[in-house]
């Protein structure tokens, strides 16, 4: 199981890292970088996603088709609550949905979290702007959201 932490609040991030000291925590802002776009996540890997309210929808969209449990970072109080959620929580696994590739995840995360424009993402990743737009479109299409802007993933 991999634990991924997604929040814009650095204080909350630091507190959650201290709370999860027995797990190896991956920070989403450091994981979804253009350098990591060639990484291939294992198909049977489980992900514990801890995100704030603003980025919850984005993370759910990015991990659709994978085995994951998503928790709201603002509602967590102690490590016992986290371990209870891991053992008794409802793990999401939609085998019918196609999982996003790492390149699609990197583009969607960069577009929403870092608020980078497609031309900036294209230059960082060494690809064309049309390819970035294709990644955004196919990422949304794999979630059944045809013709919907990626910016709609921000919010509760």
Question: For each predicted feature, which ranges?
Answer:
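Residues within the DNA-recognition helix of helix-turn-helix
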Residues: 134-138
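The DNA-recognition helices of helix-turn-helix-type DNA-binding domains
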Residues: 23, 128, 139-140
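Helix-turn-helix DNA-binding segment
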Residues: 90-133
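Basic, Lys/Arg-enriched C-terminal extension of HTH/homeodomain DNA-binding domains
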Residues: 141-156
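Short polybasic/polar patches that bind polyanions
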Residues: 21, 123, 141
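N-terminal regulatory/sensing modules of transcriptional regulators
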Residues: 1-90
